[in-house]
């Protein structure tokens, strides 16, 4: 109804090529590529990426999940995977993450509901290796005393001595983050976590190529839906200015109505008990 034309099944390898036909381009591609940690056993059969698992769940396709599942990660997506596995019939489900319990990034409600469903939580764990020959048989862990990040944003982990332990599993799901599905061949400068670099995440959504802007998870990683909407609106306002407008994209979805402060007379109001005065 608004004149938007949707082109489906189109692959755009170089966004700059779109500038031949369009005055401005917005990259709102999200973060739909799962992260596979470069650790021993990560390529074994039975190791699944979060986005693939949840996509297959949503489409009713086979997930490749077994009966004993370990989810590596402590955010909301990790618990989405764990609780989905529960509903798909997994008999034993573990969620393990690097953060201590009080610092886990998942919503507290998600964590509590998972525990109520019988999902086992293992905070402050480092993933040493995924075991198996051909197919996953489990994961070796060690307890984490503390961890920090170096100047390259790599985790520096302080392990507890003699704390190595093993949890058996036939399925391991990586849920340690997502990234935009884009490469340097696209011709845009990229930032941390394969994000699209913009001049300023908060105030300037322009990319390294003139006329191309970016917004949402593609520039700052996986956040909430409302943050993506806000980022998209900010980008739309900036694009409007780029095209010669004033950047005002506000709209009134319904006419404003000023309520009438007068609600009438209630006989004997002054003699009523306070609890009966509420309307």
Q: Where are each of the predicted segments found?
A:
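Rossmann-like dinucleotide-binding cores of NAD(P)H-dependent redox enzymes
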Residues: 1, 6-10, 57, 82-129, ...
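Cofactor-binding loop segments of dinucleotide-utilizing enzymes, especially the Rossmann-like FAD-
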Residues: 30, 74, 97-100, 217
């Amino acid at each position: 109804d608004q004149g938007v034309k949707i082109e489906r099944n189109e692959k755009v390898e170089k966004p700059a090529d779109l500038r031949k036909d369009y005055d401005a381009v917005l990259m709102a591609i999200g973060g739909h590529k799962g992260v596979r940690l470069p650790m021993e056993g990560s390529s074994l059969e039975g190791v699944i990426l979060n986005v693939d698992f949840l996509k297959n769940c949503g489409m009713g396709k086979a997930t490749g999940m077994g009966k004993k599942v370990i989810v590596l990660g402590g955010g909301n997506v990790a618990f989405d995977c764990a609780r989905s596995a529960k509903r798909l019939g997994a008999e034993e489900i573990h969620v393990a993450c690097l953060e201590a319990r009080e610092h886990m990034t998942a919503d507290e409600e998600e964590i509590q509901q998972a525990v109520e469903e019988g999902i086992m939580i293992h905070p402050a764990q480092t993933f040493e290796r995924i075991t198996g020959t051909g197919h996953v048989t489990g994961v070796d862990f060690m307890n984490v005393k503390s961890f920090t990040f170096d100047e390259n944003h790599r985790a520096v982990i302080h392990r507890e001595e003699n704390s190595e332990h093993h949890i058996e599993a036939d399925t391991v799901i990586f849920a340690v983050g997502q990234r935009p599905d884009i490469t340097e061949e696209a011709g845009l400068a990229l930032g941390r976590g394969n994000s699209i670099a913009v001049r300023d995440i908060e105030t300037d959504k322009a990319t390294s190529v003139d006329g191309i802007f970016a917004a949402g998870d593609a520039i700052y990683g996986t956040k909430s839906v409302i943050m993506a909407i806000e980022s998209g609106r900010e980008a739309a306002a900036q694009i409007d200015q780029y095209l010669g407008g004033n950047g005002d994209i506000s709209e009134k979805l319904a006419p404003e109505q000023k309520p009438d402060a007068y609600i009438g007379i209630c006989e004997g109001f002054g003699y009523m008990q306070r609890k009966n005065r509420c309307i």
